[in-house]
Each structure stands twice: as structure tokens, then as C-alpha cells.
Amino acid sequence: MAKKSAENGIYSVSGDEKKGPLIVSGPDGAPAKGDGPAGLGAPGGRLAVPPRETWTRQMDFIMSCVGFAVGLGNVWRFPYLCYKNGGGVFLIPYVLIALVGGIPIFFLEISLGQFMKAGSINVWNICPLFKGLGYASMVIVFYCNTYYIMVLAWGFYYLVKSFTTTLPWATCGHTWNTPDCVEIFRHEDCANASLANLTCDQLADRRSPVIEFWENKVLRLSTGLEVPGALNWEVTLCLLACWVLVYFCVWKGVKSTGKIVYFTATFPYVVLVVLLVRGVLLPGALDGIIYYLKPDWSKLGSPQVWIDAGTQIFFSYAIGLGALTALGSYNRFNNNCYKDAIILALINSGTSFFAGFVVFSILGFMATEQGVHISKVAESGPGLAFIAYPRAVTLMPVAPLWAALFFFMLLLLGLDSQFVGVEGFITGLLDLLPASYYFRFQREISVALCCALCFVIDLSMVTDGGMYVFQLFDYYSASGTTLLWQAFWECVVVAWVYGADRFMDDIACMIGYRPCPWMKWCWSFFTPLVCMGIFIFNIVYYEPLVYNNTYVYPWWGEAMGWAFALSSMLCVPLHLLGCLLRAKGTMAERWQHLTQPIWGLHHLEYRAQDADVRGLTTLTPVSESSKVVVVESVM
């Protein structure tokens, strides 16, 4: 099971590792405290290392990354930002920031996970002093897992309600409608109708059944955050169904997840193509597409355009969440992650651009039918998914079919992003657990506990005041500010503390050649500058959260939001400070010791080829029958 290298005196691991964990030990044999099994543990620690599973096929990894990174933001946020920020002009800052910031960090996270064979926390064994980055990403992805699934619950609810002959949001007269509800959608209907002395413009200010279904039936919206109200049991059951679905997608690990994403990641593209074909055949579709792409060069000098481009890149590429490192950790050590990262980035951005044609062809039709400017119907986020599009399908023949198709696509887009996010969190969590917690059903129980905890927190979002809670999570916990902060430190640590050239050599060891020098330059200079620049702009131009342009959050609600943001951002400095204070020696000695990488077992053969094998002295077989290995570390 272990063989000795004649040249270096170092053993490498081989044989059947599935029969038991691998034991990693320090020279004193003392049990490790706090660090997990992905690397060689804390200096002088003893840890059991469960064998790490890998993707059955490399395409499983590609599909999982596509499913995770290509999500709701590509469909409901990018097209609106493109229209809002000068149409085709928006593509200039978007592409530039993708080249300088998005793609380099996307590649960095995947390659780091593949090289270290660890989840979001233990991947920073490459520089243990900055392991706070791992804790920060775990906090962020936990918040995302908690609130993101609410969109799936709402989409699932709309999907169920679409299986009717008449869509419930198409007409008034329901128990949730008010006397102000008006069913007239088409401008020509408005001109020919008896309006009780109301003009068409005045009628447009009345309540549509689409808005009343969303606010009064689905959300049962209260007056504010301070009025939580009761649970909406229909939406609660949809939420429970979504969590059960997520659990069974994740509970067996990447072997099962890698199969499910073949459907969840590809079928939305089929639906997008069908919706595009339908959309371009509608009257007014061309006008909508022109509004989507029409360049407004004056916007290029606006700082907000660059801020929106940067935050959208980091959102849509799913940077800073730790899930990409978790997915990369299941790759074969020699997988060409460089090629994969480029392909995945192109798919992500291409999907965003393509989705814009789908969305704005339908919004153009909607504006034409209502006789209004497209700015009156163009919306982003939940407003597009649950107000604008449901309103548009009521104007189409066979409306329930198009509604069901759209919400099924929405459900799949969100589902794979959700369960891969949960997978990333679980991977980081299991890597943290010490040897004594390793048992057969460890993953199944951990996933169940995670899903149950998130479901309990989600109950606050299915109350009458739940939308206000959802907006708090969305605006603060995984905001552009937190992701930019995370990305900045990732680049600084890898490029300046560990060493950009050193990491390029590590990548060359995996894929057989050094990537383009552009990646090294970006990690070292361009990307940190871009991240910090947009981060500062976000702080300077910060505006307190307002819901629906009317409800201003109370001071304690805003304080709660900043607590969400700071709970991840402070992980880096607090962990760094704590490590330096606990260590012994001069400050220089502490820094040198705490920035020394902790290598994993899979690095043995690779590191043994170097003249300077840092941190490893011997690898001794302990028990041939139990397939246990002891590695001594001088770190």
C-alpha cells in the first residue's frame, strides 16, 4: 500500500485506499486540535484522512460547475443591467472586468481546490495563517443556501398554480384581490373599455391581478419587518419539498450529484431556446431586443456602470463562496483545470448574453401590448420572475403552457445552484471534522442536519413579513461588498504570501504546462486593484436598503444586515490576529511558521521530486491490513 522512493526516502501512497482512513501524524503523536483531515493537520497533529472521492467522469465536474455558476442571476439580473447601463455599451466594462477579475479568480479557485484536494476551509492549508478566508466563504455560502432556496419555493408554487385552464394571476375576483384590482392589460382594451371616468394612464396606476397575486397571495406582505405575521402554509410546504429534493441530490456526494446535473444544467437551455423562438415571433419583440442592445455611450463614464459590471461578474461566476474549490477538489490531480475554467467562464457569460434576447423579446411584446415604454415593464430580480413574466404570459395564447415552462426552467436553474452550494458547504464541514467523527453515514447525517437548520431559518421568510427578511439576506449577507472583499484577499494570499510563480509551478505540475502569464499578472496586480476599487465605490455609494422604493428599513434591521456582512468579512483579520497572538517566537518567526504550507498525502509523490521537501520527513506503514499510513511532519 505504500512504497518507498529510493532517491528521497519518502513513501507514496498506493493500493486500495477505500478500506479505511489514512492516519496523519506528527512527531509527538498527539491528537490534532481543530484542523481537519484534508491536509497533514496542524503541526504535530494526528488525523484520520478518509479517502477522497473523485468525479466518475470529468464531464460531471463541468456540468456541476455550469449548474452552480449559471443560475437565476444570468436570466433575471444581467439582461436588466445591460439595458439599464447603456445596452451594448455595458458589454465593454463587463468583458474587461471578466478578463481582469472574473476569469482569473474563477481559475484560481478551481485550481486551488484541485491542487489541495480540500474544501473551502482546508484548501487554505496552502497558507494556514489566512485560513479565515475559508471560514468566511463557509459563512457566505451558508447564508446563500439559506435564502436562495426561497426563490425555488416561490417558483415551485407558481409552477403548481400554472396547471390550470386559467392562470390565477390573470383575473380579479379571488379572495386575495382588492377593489382596486383591474384585469385590463392591453392598451387597445383600455381604449375601448368603459373606465368610469378614468383615463388609461390613471388605470395603469391601479392594481393588476399579477401584483396582487404576488403580494397578497404568495407573500401576504405585511407592513414591515417589525410585523412578521403568520406562516404561509402553502409556500412552507413548497419550501419543504425543495429542501427534500436538495437533500436527495446531495446526500450521496459527487457520485450522485454529478449525474443529476446532466439534466438540471442542460434542460434550462432547451427551455431558453423554446422561449426565444416563441418570443421573437411576438409583435414588438424586435423593439425589445433593440432596447436591450442599443448603445448609450454616455453611460461608459458613469462609475455605477462599472460597479454593476463588477458585481454581476462576481455574482454570476459564484466567486468567493468556496463551492468552486470544493468542486475542484474532486478532480483528478492531473485534470486540465485551466482549460475547464476558460470553457466554463465563456459558457457563463454567453448564457447571460443569450438570456437577454429571451427576456427582452418578451418584454418588448409586453410593452407593445400595453402601449407603454419598455422602461415601464423592464424589471430585475424577483420583479421579473414573479411580476413581469407572469404578466406577459397572460397576453399569450395557451398561457398556462408558457408559464409552466418558464417556472420549470426557473426551478432547475436554481436547483443545481442550490444543491451544489450545499455540497460546497458540506465538503468544507466534513474536511474540518477530526478523526473521531469519521463513520459510515457521516455525510448523510451532516447533510440532513444542514438542510434541517436552513429550513428552520427559512421559516422566517415564509411569514407575512418574510420578504423583508429575504431582502436583508440578499442585500447584505452575500452582497458584492462581501464577495469583493473575499476575492481581494484570495489574490493577495496566493500571489504575494504563497507566491504567484510558485503557484504557477504547482499548476504546471498538475496540467503539464504553465498557464498564460496573464493569470499571474492578474492575481498579483490587476485583480486586487479591480476588487478594491469596486469595493471602495460600493462603500462610498452605499445606499440603505429600501424595499419596493417605499419601505425604509428600521435602524435595527439595517444593523442586522451589516451584522450578516461583517460576520464573514471579519473572519480574515480575526483569524489572522488570533493565530499570530497564539504562536511563539518573534513576529517574523511566527509569520514564517504560520505561512508554511501544510501538504496533503497526494502531494507526497509530487513534493518528493523537489530537492527541498518542505514539512515531510517520513511516511511509515502502520498496519497493512487496515491500510493505515503515518506521515511525520516537522511543521
Curated annotation (Swiss-Prot):
This is Sodium- and chloride-dependent creatine transporter 1. CDD domains: SLC6sbd_CT1 (cd11509). Glycosylated. Pfam families: SNF (PF00209). Its main location: membrane. Creatine:sodium symporter which mediates the uptake of creatine. Plays an important role in supplying creatine to the brain via the blood-brain barrier. Belongs to the sodium:neurotransmitter symporter (SNF) (TC 2.A.22) family. SLC6A8 subfamily. One of its GO terms (molecular function) is creatine:sodium symporter activity. GO terms for biological process: creatine transmembrane transport; neurotransmitter transport. Keywords: Cell membrane, Glycoprotein, Ion transport, Membrane, Phosphoprotein, Sodium, Sodium transport, Symport, Transmembrane, Transmembrane helix, Transport. The keyword Acyltransferase does not apply. Brain. Highly expressed in brain capillaries branching in all cortical layers and moderately expressed in neuronal perikarya (at protein level). Glycans are attached at residues 192, 197, 548. InterPro entries: Na/ntran_symport (IPR000175), Na/ntran_symport_creatine (IPR002984), SNS_sf (IPR037272). One of its GO terms (cellular component) is apical plasma membrane. Residues 82-87, 160-230, 291-304, 363-394, 466-479, 542-560 are extracellular.
